[in-house]
């Protein structure tokens, strides 16, 4: 969606029909990583620290092999733009910076994305969409 020339995105995994237990575990792991990433972000934090926690948490819950990329990228005139959060990102998060928290996990059979726009605030983030941060299974 674009508003006044600015772009954003919202991503949610949706299953048509019931998920297998393995699928549901991976989708839940993605949601957990996604929400924790937003918890770790606030003004004054070095970007690479968010990335470090993201990958450490992926190791802890056993999904590091399923991470395609992550955890965040800039948001502005294009949906995906600088700055990216990477393990070597030396910049500090500053108030009013905008990021897409973009959690992408995959396995042999499927992939999933959780994505929310955020604004960096002094004590955390303001999410641009908090709707449907839950596992969605539609009848098939």
Pin down the residues of each PLM region:
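Active-site neighborhoods and metal-handling regions in enzymes and metal-associated proteins
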Residues: 1-140
């Amino acid at each position: 969606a674009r508003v006044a020339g600015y772009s954003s995105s919202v991503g949610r995994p949706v299953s048509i029909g019931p998920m297998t237990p393995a699928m549901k575990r991976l989708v839940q792991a993605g949601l957990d990583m996604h929400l924790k990433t937003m918890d770790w972000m606030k003004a004054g934090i070095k970007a690479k620290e968010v990335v470090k926690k993201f990958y450490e948490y992926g190791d802890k819950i056993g999904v590091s092999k399923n991470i395609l990329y992550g955890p965040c990228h800039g948001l502005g005139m294009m949906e995906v733009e600088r700055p990216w959060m990477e393990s070597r990102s030396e910049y500090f998060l500053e108030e009013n910076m905008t990021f897409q928290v973009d959690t992408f996990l995959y396995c042999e059979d499927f992939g999933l994305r959780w994505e929310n726009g955020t604004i960096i605030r002094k004590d955390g983030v303001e999410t641009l969409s908090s709707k449907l941060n839950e596992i969605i299974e539609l009848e098939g």
